[in-house]
């Protein structure tokens, strides 16, 4: 399928369903509150955690956006949490807010700030604390990880499954890989609902650069496997996710797939991504009032 071509009617219906209530991931850089303001009231916004900005910045932005009526999901990076006391203070920041979901990841801090080396460590600590979260997301790698074996990734998911309510995948360009991975999870007894991580409408060159830096993109094996896609990404101005999202929507149309939506990596290009979602589901293209 041509990734820029409008989907057929049946595919359009599946795509509209998949894109109903998407998650918009943003980076808590300066000015992000103004960029998010174009989203409709109540939209789900996830706020990343970066060693360069700190978890406190993640929570500052999360609290501010929640106060504006968004459904906010802060990322908690285990390797950025220095101690149980630090974790308790972070949770206290959310007291009095409507934030009821977190996304727990290992993170990129090297060395780690404390004793939490991966998401499993932090999830186990969270389970022993009083916290307000009705939903806890964890990450998944449909195309594998350059530094972790597939078996180790599966074992980590088995460890984390009791503490989580859903899986959110790493940025992915291969719908078939997502489908194979979901089937593998089910065969291995991992039954968490899956939210598929897709690129939003972003600058192709920037997307290519970030794809090489983030997660699986750092490995030579990834470059060998996806080099053609990376070159293609860099050739024109903006990436259109319609084709990829439509392919994912076909798999998601099977209720047994367990695919429950999409997590859109906006890289802070919120407005064009929002406009694409609105066009795809047939809704109005208008900012929040």
Describe the residue ranges of each PLM region:
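Conserved, mostly hydrophobic/aromatic
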Residues: 74, 160-163, 196, 248, ...
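Glycine- and other small-residue-rich loops at beta-strand/loop junctions that grip anionic moieties
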Residues: 24-25, 50, 79, 146-149, ...
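Charge-patterned, long linear interaction tracts outside catalytic cores
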Residues: 160, 259-275
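Active-site glycine- and acidic-residue-rich loops that bind
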Residues: 81-85, 110-118, 169-182, 204, ...
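Active-site glycine-rich loop that binds ribose-phosphate moieties when present
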Residues: 147-167, 177
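Active-site pocket-lining/capping segments in soluble small-molecule metabolic enzymes
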Residues: 24-28, 115-141, 191-253, 268, ...
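Catalytic cores of alpha/beta
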Residues: 84-93, 151-157, 180-186, 203-211, ...
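Active-site beta->alpha loop and helix N-cap motifs at the rims of alpha/beta catalytic domains
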Residues: 2-154
